[in-house]
């Protein structure tokens, strides 16, 4: 990436995510009063005193407990530290140092990066200095009293931090494609991301809902850069309490909006559920390119009709995203995983594609000759004067007609099908804007406007 990385390390519930949000200037890491909310490592851009860098939020470190996700969180923290240029060790100034802090400090002293000790929750500057002084005993140098919530003391910490960061590599113009990986809990989104990245970048567990943040991972294939956004699994609203999971789902929807292409991951064993349909509808509403990824295909018992039957079911259940490519993969074995990126690249190209006005009107002329527009009860027939593409991402075509309400849904779908059959647009939704226009306005338009259909 070219930017120095700063790892944020500490035991659970000391305010690491709050500090990350303070440094990055946005609430991206989930902050909640439930201990251990951050499980994976999350990369965010930060800026201080003309220096750009990335901060990496990690899960809460606990060395003397191997239950649940704790060994995996340690692995994530170690991976973050391995790629970091510096680390900020966050401790709780209100409770003072404890044995967990001492264990982490001992581990950090063995690491080859400079470590800065941030004593958080020092809300009073006078009292904060006293609270911070207790942490000299950790042997990591000067403790910096800070308040991640209010920002007190973070300037002094960052002033010292940036002195130890290596020079920023000049970044080339980035041609990355942003991909959001979405789906219900436990369909294999994180396994898929790890298969792309070639490392255990995200905690993978059979327990539903292991991933809580939207996390960015950067990969490159054949000169093309991809930014992969893994997201918390999306459940039905009635099964969500308004705590951490509520914020995760909200962030997953934001990840869809950030993305160029969305991977809708479906569990091959469960088939298409009502929630999958709602997610597909969300992708369509946001106008995003999409690839449908049917995961766990290796676990499906197959005969000569399996793929045919599955495709018919997908076509029936996801008919409103029939324009999206579908691929059957196994994130665990790696089967066809790399092929996904080829489909993503093609979908992204179609999403950004622009078609000339003359070509659009040739398609319209043929479509109208094959199937005339509807006629009103009074005998007045609908007329399409001309069409022109007005934007991309998604491709959006304005159709100027004599009376928009005269064109019913069936005819509108027919025109969209004609555009797809003649022009492609595989992998992306297209939007048609039906605009009423009086014929005299059309005839008085500029001479180089599209020919009337």
UniProtKB/Swiss-Prot annotation:
List each coiled-coil range. none
Which InterPro entries does the entry link to?
A: G_ENGA (IPR031166), GTP-bd (IPR006073), GTPase_Der (IPR016484), KH_dom-like (IPR032859), KH_dom-like_a/b (IPR015946), P-loop_NTPase (IPR027417), Small_GTP-bd (IPR005225)
Domain KH-like intervals: 353-438
Task: Please name the CDD domains in this protein's record.
Answer: EngA1, EngA2
Swiss-Prot/TrEMBL GO biological process terms: ribosome biogenesis
**UniProt-annotated binding residues for GTP 2:** 183-190, 230-234, 295-298
Supply the alphabetized keyword list: GTP-binding, Nucleotide-binding, Repeat, Ribosome biogenesis
What SUPFAM superfamilies does this protein map onto?
A: P-loop containing nucleoside triphosphate hydrolases
- The UniProt record lists the EngA-type G domain at 4-169, 177-352
The positions annotated for binding GTP 1 are 10-17, 57-61, 120-123
Q: Does the keyword Repeat apply?
A: yes
Molecular function as annotated in GO: GTP binding; ribosome binding
Family annotation (Pfam families) = KH_dom-like, MMR_HSR1
Its job:
GTPase that plays an essential role in the late steps of ribosome biogenesis.
Assembly:
Associates with the 50S ribosomal subunit.
> Can you tell me which family this protein belongs to?
Belongs to the TRAFAC class TrmE-Era-EngA-EngB-Septin-like GTPase superfamily. EngA (Der) GTPase family.
Q: Which NCBIfam families does this chain map to?
A: GTPase_EngA, small_GTP
- What this protein is called in its record is GTPase Der
Q: Which organism is it from?
A: Trichormus variabilis (strain ATCC 29413 / PCC 7937) (Anabaena variabilis)
**What does the organism's lineage look like at the top?**
Bacteria, Bacillati, Cyanobacteriota, Cyanophyceae, Nostocales
What would be the name of the gene that encodes this protein?
der
